[in-house]
Structure formats: structure tokens, C-alpha cells
């Protein structure tokens, strides 16, 4: 993947054509004028609200006049259809890099209802520019992948109808001191529009409730945070705590109503027991009755 600003300074070819001078403002570029897409590949989330997506076009130099360009669709390399799956915002495929500036954006919008989950949609764009401004090393095209992203609504995700309904879950997990993977029922309740409290994740005998926080700010990277908190008592160590692991983020999926917690179990000032994965599927009350696979009576606390 091309990152223009980094490559401009890092690649041997760029170094040959670039003459840099040191000033109070830092390093400045004084080579030829090139204009291109800032990257070769973008992923565009398509949501059920009026969101636009920007594809930056960058120039290596500024100019004292406006620079106008057109952007065209490369049909033979595109699977998405303009007017059906996406459009240019304001129906305009023209951009202007204003005088004194280096960047302008191609603005796109997706049509959520016309895109299916299984669709593999790509838009290939070509920048129409003077030949002298095209940098052969990077070309004048880019690709935009369209990905449908369902909205995150807590009640729908948890499959509850009322705010105070019990949350029913199927949990697939293994626990410390036991290498086998098992499936259990688990339960909880909604605290607010982004927080779920798990009441029996570590077994009914555990009095500790586990708080997890959903973050949907980036629709392409739906994350869960589990703050540091006591999880259960262990006979030799006392309270064992759990927390999210930065290197292995916990996440959730709005298509299939499931979430995955990757947690470190540890005792403060003593050390870690390891990192464990817990997979949860949200089910409604009817599915819970049909499933009837018993409460999660086994957990860390079962080995105390």
C-alpha cells in the first residue's frame, strides 16, 4: 500500500528527484510538480446514515492558482455501479486544489440499502491530469473497497426488547487450570447504550460482575474495552482480576450479534495467569428457552 507522504521522503527514486533545503520551517520539497491519489487502496464503510467518504488527492508542490481536475471511474476494474451502490457527493467528480494548498478530496457516498453483506464491491478511480503531472512511479489510479456496516444499536445487538430485559448469551470458552473448551449459558444486563454487565461469566458462585464497553466509532474496527476489574476469588491468591489486552483487541460483530473478549487474568503485584479468549453469541428469550443448555456453573471459581 502506498503512503505518499512517507514514500516521498523514503524511496530512492523520490530522493533522486527531490532537492531538500533546511530552513526554520523544516524540510521543503523543491522537485517537479506531481499530483496523485494519496494511497492506492481505501476501504469505505457504507452505513445507513448520510456519511461521506473522502479520497485525498495530493500534490507535491503548492501553486499560486487553483488547479482543477476530473476523476473518472475505470469501469473494467470496478464492480460497484455508480447510482446504484455509490455516488459522487453533489454528483460532481471534479476537484480543485486551491491556490496555496496541496490537497483536495474526492467525496463519495454509499447507498446502504442497495448493498448486501456478501457483495464484493470495488470502485476504481483514475485522476485525469496533464501528463507532466503524473508520477510514473505511482500512477494516477486508486481503488476503493465498499463494505456494508450495519448500525450498532445496543438493544438490537443484545436481542432484548426492553431496557431492563435479561441479556441471554451462549459462551464458548476455556478457563485457567483446564485446557478443554466448553459451551455455557451466560447472562447479563444492559447498563447503558454502550455498556454491558455480565453477571455470571465466571460461574454463578462468583459474586463479581464484569463490565464491558462497546465502541463503534470506527465502523470498520468495532472494539470492546474491559477495564481492569476483580473477576473472582481464588483460594490461594485472593481476588483474580481481568482486563483487555492491547495487543489482542476484543471486538464485536453487528451482522451476527456476537462478541469476542480476549482477556488477561492476573493478580496485582503477583503476575499474570495468561490470556484467554471468550466468545459470546447474543440470543433472545425464545432461543434461550430452546437452548436450555444450563448455566455457566464452571469457571475460574470452580477451581478454588
Language-model-detected regions and their locations in the chain:
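Bacterial N-terminal signal peptides that target proteins for export
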Residues: 1-9
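Short hydrophobic/aromatic segments of transmembrane alpha-helices and their interfaces
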Residues: 9-10, 86
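Alpha-helical transmembrane segments
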Residues: 11-15
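Ser/Thr/Gly/Pro-rich, low-complexity flexible regions
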Residues: 149-304
Amino acid at each position: 500500500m502506498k503512503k505518499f507522504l512517507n514514500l516521498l521522503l523514503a524511496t530512492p527514486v523520490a530522493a533522486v528527484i527531490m532537492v531538500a533545503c533546511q530552513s526554520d520551517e523544516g524540510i521543503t520539497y523543491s522537485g517537479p510538480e506531481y499530483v496523485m491519489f494519496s494511497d492506492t487502496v481505501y476501504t469505505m464503510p457504507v452505513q445507513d446514515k448520510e456519511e461521506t467518504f473522502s479520497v485525498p488527492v495530493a500534490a507535491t508542490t503548492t501553486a499560486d492558482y487553483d488547479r482543477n481536475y476530473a476523476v473518472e471511474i475505470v469501469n473494467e476494474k470496478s464492480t460497484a455501479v455508480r447510482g446504484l451502490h455509490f455516488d459522487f457527493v453533489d454528483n460532481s467528480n471534479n476537484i480543485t486544489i486551491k491556490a496555496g494548498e496541496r490537497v483536495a478530496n474526492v467525496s463519495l457516498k454509499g447507498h446502504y440499502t442497495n448493498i448486501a453483506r456478501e457483495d464484493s464491491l470495488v470502485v476504481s478511480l483514475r485522476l485525469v491530469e496533464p501528463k507532466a503531472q503524473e508520477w510514473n512511479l505511482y500512477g494516477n489510479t486508486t481503488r476503493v473497497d465498499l463494505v456494508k456496516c450495519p448500525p450498532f444499536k445496543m438493544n438490537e445487538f443484545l436481542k432484548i426488547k426492553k431496557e431492563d430485559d435479561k441479556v441471554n448469551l451462549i459462551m464458548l470458552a476455556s478457563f485457567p487450570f483446564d485446557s478443554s473448551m466448553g459451551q455455557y449459558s451466560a447472562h447479563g444486563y444492559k447498563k447503558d447504550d454502550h455498556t454491558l454487565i455480565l453477571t455470571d461469566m465466571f460461574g454463578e458462585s462468583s459474586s463479581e460482575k464484569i463490565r464491558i464497553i462497546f465502541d463503534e466509532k470506527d465502523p470498520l474496527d468495532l472494539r470492546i474495552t474491559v477495564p481492569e476489574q476483580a473477576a473472582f476469588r481464588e483460594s490461594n491468591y485472593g481476588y483474580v482480576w481481568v482486563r483487555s489486552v492491547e495487543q489482542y483487541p476484543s471486538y464485536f460483530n453487528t451482522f451476527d450479534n456476537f462478541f469476542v473478549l480476549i482477556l488477561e487474568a492476573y493478580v496485582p503485584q503477583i503476575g499474570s495467569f495468561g490470556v484467554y479468549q471468550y466468545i459470546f453469541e447474543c440470543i433472545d428469550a425464545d432461543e434461550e428457552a430452546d437452548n436450555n443448555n444450563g448455566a455457566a456453573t464452571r469457571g475460574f471459581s470452580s477451581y478454588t
